[in-house]
Regions:
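Single conserved hydrophobic/aromatic residue that forms the stacking wall/gate
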Residues: 241-250
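NAD(P)H-binding glycine-rich loop region in Rossmannoid oxidoreductase-like domains
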Residues: 41-77
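NAD(P)-dependent short-chain dehydrogenase/reductase
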Residues: 134-181, 187-188, 195
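Mid/C-terminal beta-alpha module of Rossmann-like enzyme folds, strongest
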Residues: 192, 199-240
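Adenosine-cofactor binding site in Rossmann-like domains, unifying the SAM/SAH pocket
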Residues: 27-42
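NAD(P)-cofactor binding segment of oxidoreductase domains
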Residues: 69-97
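Catalytic helix-loop patch of NAD(P)-dependent Rossmann-fold dehydrogenases
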Residues: 76, 81-84, 104-146, 151
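N-terminal Rossmann NAD(P)H-binding glycine-rich loop of SDR-like oxidoreductase domains
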Residues: 3-19
Length: 250
């Protein structure tokens, strides 16, 4: 099986490529240098030349707060870029897996979110990822939409690395304590995605590790495990963030 993977310089795409190799599958990885997903002609050319059996689309604009000031580029990447890929998958009649986000919900539920719950994004990032979901649903019959949250891995930037770096230069930090989620290791997630892409169980899914916590609780555990003496104080997200964010994405 030949699997085409976008965003391979990111933490999830990197682990997906490694997992494909472990399972004896052929992975064809690209990032923006090899294929600009906002360029429809280039997307068409590169994917058709690769002739894959499936596409795992990990590439995305993920800077949530920055998206509020860069709506056009965020939409080009997350919505138009996804649609460009979806149209090629439709033409080739191949599987497509789209990595989406918990930000397509409003975060105000009182129970864990189900894959088919109403999508009601609160910010630009969530809205553009929602538009990406609509694009794949419109164009691709064999689609997987996999919503992930709070990911961390060896490659790329993530919350753990940010906290550890801040802990080297700060004795005291404030971290939001009114957003809950499930920290998810991209190594585990990649194994699930590669297993899924080999099936025909199409549809929408949520994929995270078990357990829930707040960002504040996560930060406290990070410093505890690292043996770093850093004081962490809880704070409301409205004091730190410029964009509306879901409070509960468990």
């Amino acid at each position: 099986m030949r699997v085409f993977v976008t965003g391979v310089k990111g933490q999830l795409g990197y682990d997906v490529m490694n997992e494909l190799e472990k399972q004896g599958l052929e992975g064809i990885g690209v990032d923006i240098d090899e294929m600009d997903i906002t360029d429809a002609d280039q997307v068409n050319k590169v994917i058709k030349e690769a002739a894959p059996d499936a596409v795992i689309h990990c590439a995305a604009y993920t800077a949530v707060d920055a998206a509020e000031d860069n709506e056009e580029i965020c939409r080009k990447v997350n919505a138009q870029g996804t649609e460009n890929i979806a149209k090629v998958c439709e033409e080739l009649d191949i599987k497509m897996m789209y990595i989406s986000t918990d930000y397509v919900f409003n975060g105000q539920g009182e129970r864990p979110w189900e894959p088919d719950d109403k999508r009601e994004p609160l910010n630009v990032y969530g809205q553009t990822k929602y538009e990406g979901e609509l694009a794949i649903e419109e164009h691709v019959k064999k689609f997987f939409t996999v919503r992930i949250a709070w990911v961390f891995g060896v490659n790329g930037k993530n919350f753990i690395k940010t906290m550890l770096n801040l802990g080297k230069t700060h004795d005291h930090l404030t971290v939001v304590n009114d957003q809950t989620g499930s920290p998810t290791y991209t190594y585990d997630l990649a194994r699930l995605l590669v297993d899924m892409i080999q099936t025909d169980k199409y549809g929408r899914y949520h994929a995270t590790n078990e357990g829930i916590c707040t960002w504040y609780e996560f930060a406290c555990e990070i410093f505890k495990q690292a043996g770093m003496n850093v004081s962490v104080a809880p704070v409301s997200s409205c004091l730190l963030y410029t964009s509306p964010s879901p409070r509960d994405c468990s």
